[in-house]
């Protein structure tokens, strides 16, 4: 089905009538919390939950559901009437699990010994059917804490503060969760569900196994686009949810075909008709085991995501979530894969699906769905949860507060913040955002009432970025054609994304437009702006006193309390992120900086005689008393070019690509919003004007035609056109998978099995690999790197991954896991003039001195390039050691870099375009990958090992300019919201929804 475009014209959304206001605006009962949203959750009734489980409803309704772990918010948000005084504190805790044990495989020398009697593992846990208990060594145990044991909020710990957390998270490949089987499933009336024998249906490990299976199946059937979690965590699917035999062996079925020998055994897959969803790995209702192929430090955090929540395995419509005879799921086969046919599938036969969504659904969470219709959904507090789970969580509410009994969410598609503000005034809502256009009115109207609360964002909860498409071409039959809504010239611009011209255009848009001036239109209180793929507030820095502190809005001159301040700020400390490095006059009140120059570096490869490589190899061999057996002469080389981007060179780059007044670049900016506030209208009008002005040639030709397109990026009807596969620009809306900088990097570098991505943000993964190859291809580096990876030293593999603690100190339990020092690499000048390498890897004292004089360059270029190169070599070796990249292909690539890197780095009169599917963006590196789809996972793990690792990856991606700058509430933004005085809201700093922890004060309190 083709996406229906939602075009937006000047001031069009201001015409939204008050007719869309709530029909029932009467004052609500004190214990009923009423909110409204512009999202049309039930627009497509056939797929309201999108994934056969509770997602995406949990994205809209916060923590009304429950999982193995959860984030809670303790304390209260308080303000002085203008600014925030105190905010809630966040903790990651066990929720439906009473404890979790981490296990690692015993080595062969000790495998015959009995299970470890580690004092933190109080009992011998029962193994699953996949392996014997004696094969595993218990690392440690974390238990659920109780608020009824006298602990207060300050005494209760987050999982991440537990003594054994670091060791478990770094070493465990099996997590055994003890399930709280005392809690009962309740129906839409809040009553315990009974089985056929009249017994209460209680929570079981099988409910989690079924939840995992439903999520995996929907991913395998290409029904949801979040299946990457399986690769990200490294889930061992067969051991965790696969079918079993009584003897514990993996189920096999006999196959006999022309392609396979008679009697050869084949594992039953989850997409096979023969897969039996009622054959469980979890034989003990109280134990659920999650197996990983290698340690993943963020597994416990990720278990708080809705994709891994339980669904009742005994429910008839849960049993129906399978393929095969009599299944409501209908699929088509294409290229050996099964793809869900959403037209023919009977969603009414699936749990939580169809027009009867949520009808006859069960709950073990803090709220259950009592009723719903097209315009509203009603949640009621689950007394079973409060009886069995709430006492075992840290206390969240004050003594005079109670949990909110009823929550109602209205859907008002297309409504603006101004409409919601009016609804609040009329008494129809319990809370509402205060749009900037109404802030003065709110201050006056609600002075002294207690309704006006001030909020300051602590961490970014979600990125909403406008990106460049990485799918300019598609294959139809045997023919490569431009994708729909993309012209041939636009396809050339997108395809040759590594070219000097494409880089000039992207850098010019980010650096020659005065985005911070525009941001003040949308966020008048601060003008906060983010240029980076990684938003503010992510790094936990180590202060001078050794304490771990969250990033603060402080000056970044030498002597700052932050030793490693990545998010520096200039221009009145209002600009955040990796800011485009530019020179010239900063014209504050101009939206296009016509006299400015943006500094970038362009990297390319070229064929050579190989003499430079031969000389380097010979010198290396002589200095190390060894023959040069590790590297033959290079047959091509890499080079750098400093590029100054001005308005004139920007226009010239557009013309060289082929854009003109009659053939312009259609800059269709897609948004996640289904409506805009008055400030939003003004902001995007100004953005359109700035883009038009920047792209206007001296003769008046307009080479850029901007367009604003509204849409609901979180709704179930999002399709390929909207997320950017068939237009120049796409939209990426994403929330962090866990609490760390690596989570943003794994999202930004996600690839498919062939090395391609959905939007260019994800194609940044290929750009990172390209940069690593550039670094290793330097003439004084390649032979040394080759010798290093040929050595049988793989200490950097994930089996020994060590992640820094919150205070940046290394875990004392680490073994031989030190990162390569690369002391033998003493010369690497490729990046010495790169302004972004200089900014982040140059000498700190030189940076401070040059900043004090107003210079935008900093540090010693030669030293910065060397440090940057060493980081690149460390990551490249890490990826080789962990089987993400093929060692022999990497050696081949740095011997002849032009073979892999020369594909899309030049604009050549329209001839440089793909001739087959294998030539698509990123696919030129496909031979180098062993596991392209896991690149993002290992990028994130490596990033979390050290702040400078993360800084390296961010520098590489941000200087590629894959996303547009975006105004986003940051460290300086304090904004008002409306909330009835008897309610207390709590939002976790990580942005995780904590509606479960909201409270209301009864009238007699």
Curated annotation (Swiss-Prot):
Membrane topology classification: Lipid-anchor
Keywords linked to the UniProt accession: Cell membrane, Lipoprotein, Membrane, Palmitate, Signal
InterPro entries listed in its UniProt record: DUF5396
The protein's name: Uncharacterized lipoprotein MG321 homolog
Biased composition (Low complexity): 110-131, 145-156
Stretch list, region Disordered: 105-165, 786-825
Transmembrane stretches, start-end: none
One Pfam family matching this protein: DUF5396
Residue stretches of biased makeup (Polar residues): 786-801
Covalent lipid sites (S-diacylglycerol cysteine): 25
A GO term from the CC aspect: plasma membrane
Keyword set includes Hydrolase: no
Residues spanning the signal sequence: 1-24
Organism: Mycoplasma pneumoniae (strain ATCC 29342 / M129 / Subtype 1) (Mycoplasmoides pneumoniae)
Keyword Acetylation: no
Subcellular location: Cell membrane
Lipidation (N-palmitoyl cysteine): 25
SUPFAM superfamilies: Periplasmic binding protein-like II
Gene3D superfamilies noted in UniProt: Dipeptide-binding Protein, Domain 1
Primary location recorded for the protein, binned into one broad class: membrane
């Amino acid at each position: 089905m083709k996406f229906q475009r939602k075009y937006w014209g000047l001031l069009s959304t201001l015409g939204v009538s008050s007719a869309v206001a709530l029909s029932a605006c009467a004052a609500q009962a004190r214990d009923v919390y009423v909110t409204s949203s512009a999202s049309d959750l039930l627009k497509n009734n056939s797929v309201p939950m999108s994934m056969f489980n509770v997602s995406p409803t949990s994205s809209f309704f916060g923590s009304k559901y429950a999982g193995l772990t959860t984030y809670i918010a303790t304390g209260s948000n308080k303000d002085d009437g203008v600014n925030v005084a105190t905010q809630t504190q966040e903790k990651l805790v066990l929720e439906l699990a009473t404890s979790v044990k981490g296990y690692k495989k015993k080595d062969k020398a000790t495998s015959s010994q009995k299970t470890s009697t580690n004092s933190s593992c109080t009992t011998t846990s029962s193994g699953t059917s996949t392996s014997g208990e004696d094969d595993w060594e218990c690392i440690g145990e974390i238990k659920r804490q109780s608020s009824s044991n006298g602990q207060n909020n300050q005494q209760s710990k987050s999982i991440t503060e537990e003594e054994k957390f670091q060791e478990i998270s770094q070493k465990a490949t099996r997590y055994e969760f003890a399930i709280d089987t005392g809690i009962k499933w309740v129906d839409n009336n809040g009553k315990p569900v009974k089985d056929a024998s009249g017994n209460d249906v209680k929570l079981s490990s099988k409910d989690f196994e079924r939840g995992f299976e439903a999520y995996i199946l929907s991913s395998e059937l290409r029904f949801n686009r979040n299946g990457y979690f399986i690769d990200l965590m490294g889930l061992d699917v067969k051991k965790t949810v696969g079918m079993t035999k009584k003897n514990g062996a993996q189920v096999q079925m006999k196959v006999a075909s022309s392609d396979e020998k008679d009697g050869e055994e084949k594992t039953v897959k989850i997409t096979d008709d023969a897969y039996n969803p009622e054959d469980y790995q979890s034989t003990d209702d109280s134990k659920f085991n999650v197996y990983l192929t290698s340690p993943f430090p963020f597994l416990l955090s990720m278990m708080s995501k809705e994709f891994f929540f339980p669904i009742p395995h005994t429910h008839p419509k849960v049993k129906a979530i399978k393929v095969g005879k009599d299944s409501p799921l209908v699929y088509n086969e294409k290229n050996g894969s099964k793809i869900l046919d959403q037209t023919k599938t009977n969603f009414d036969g699936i749990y939580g699906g169809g027009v009867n969504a949520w009808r006859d659904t069960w709950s073990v969470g803090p709220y259950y769905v009592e009723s719903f219709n097209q315009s509203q959904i009603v949640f009621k507090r689950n007394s079973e949860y409060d009886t069995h789970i709430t006492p075992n969580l840290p206390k969240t509410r004050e003594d005079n507060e109670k949990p909110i009994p009823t929550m109602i969410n209205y859907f008002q598609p297309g409504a603006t913040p101004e409409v919601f503000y009016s609804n609040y005034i009329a008494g129809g809502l319990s809370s509402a955002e205060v749009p900037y256009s109404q802030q003065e009115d709110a201050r006056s109207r609600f002075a002294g009432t207690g309704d006006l609360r001030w909020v300051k964002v602590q961490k970014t909860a979600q990125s909403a970025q406008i990106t460049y498409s990485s799918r300019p071409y598609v294959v139809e039959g045997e023919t490569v054609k431009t994708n729909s809504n993309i012209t041939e010239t636009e396809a050339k611009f997108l395809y040759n994304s590594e070219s000097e011209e494409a880089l000039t255009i992207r850098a010019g848009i980010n650096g020659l437009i005065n985005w911070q001036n525009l941001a003040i239109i949308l966020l008048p209180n601060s003008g906060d702006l983010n240029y980076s793929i990684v938003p503010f507030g992510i790094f936990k820095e180590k202060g001078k006193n050794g304490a771990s502190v969250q990033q603060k809005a402080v000056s970044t001159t030498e002597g700052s309390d932050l030793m490693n301040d990545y998010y520096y700020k200039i221009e009145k400390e209002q600009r955040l992120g990796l800011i485009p490095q530019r020179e010239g006059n900063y014209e504050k009140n101009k939206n296009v900086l016509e006299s400015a120059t943006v500094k970038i570096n362009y990297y390319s490869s070229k064929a050579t005689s190989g003499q430079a490589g031969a000389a380097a190899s010979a010198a290396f061999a002589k200095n190390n008393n060894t023959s040069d057996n590790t590297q033959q002469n290079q047959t091509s080389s890499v080079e750098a070019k400093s590029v100054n981007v001005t308005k004139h060179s920007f226009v010239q780059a557009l013309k060289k690509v082929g854009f003109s007044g009659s053939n312009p670049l259609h800059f269709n900016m897609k948004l996640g919003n289904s409506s805009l506030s008055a400030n939003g209208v003004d902001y995007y009008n100004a953005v359109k004007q700035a883009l038009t002005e920047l792209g206007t040639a001296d003769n008046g030709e307009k080479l850029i035609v901007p367009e604003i397109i509204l849409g609901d990026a979180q709704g179930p009807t999002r399709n390929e056109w909207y997320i950017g596969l068939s237009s120049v620009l796409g939209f990426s809306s994403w929330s962090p998978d866990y609490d760390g900088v690596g989570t943003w990097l794994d999202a930004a570098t996600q690839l498919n099995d062939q090395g391609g991505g959905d939007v260019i943000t994800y194609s940044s993964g290929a750009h990172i690999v390209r940069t690593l190859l550039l670094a290793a291809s330097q003439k004084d580096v390649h032979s040394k790197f080759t010798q290093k990876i040929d050595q049988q030293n793989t200490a950097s593999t994930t089996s020994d991954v060590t992640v820094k603690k919150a205070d940046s100190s290394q875990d004392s339990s680490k073994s031989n896991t030190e990162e390569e020092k690369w002391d033998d690499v003493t010369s690497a000048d490729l990046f010495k003039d790169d302004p972004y390498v200089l900014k982040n890897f140059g000498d700190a004292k030189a940076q401070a001195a040059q900043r004090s004089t107003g210079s935008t360059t900093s540090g010693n270029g030669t030293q910065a390039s060397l440090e940057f190169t060493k980081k690149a070599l460390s990551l490249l070796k890490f990826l080789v050691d962990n089987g993400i990249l093929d060692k022999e292909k990497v050696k081949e690539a740095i011997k002849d870099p032009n073979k892999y890197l020369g594909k899309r780095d030049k604009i050549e009169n329209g001839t440089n375009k793909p001739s087959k599917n294998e030539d698509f963006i990123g696919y030129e590196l496909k031979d180098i990958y062993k596991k392209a789809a896991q690149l993002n996972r290992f990028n994130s793990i490596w990033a979390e090992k050290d702040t400078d690792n993360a800084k390296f990856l961010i520098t590489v991606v941000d200087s590629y300019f894959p996303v547009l700058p975006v105004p986003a509430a940051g460290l300086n933004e304090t904004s008002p919201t409306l909330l009835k005085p008897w309610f207390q809201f709590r939002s976790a700093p990580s942005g995780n929804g904590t509606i479960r922890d909201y409270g209301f004060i009864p009238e007699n309190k």
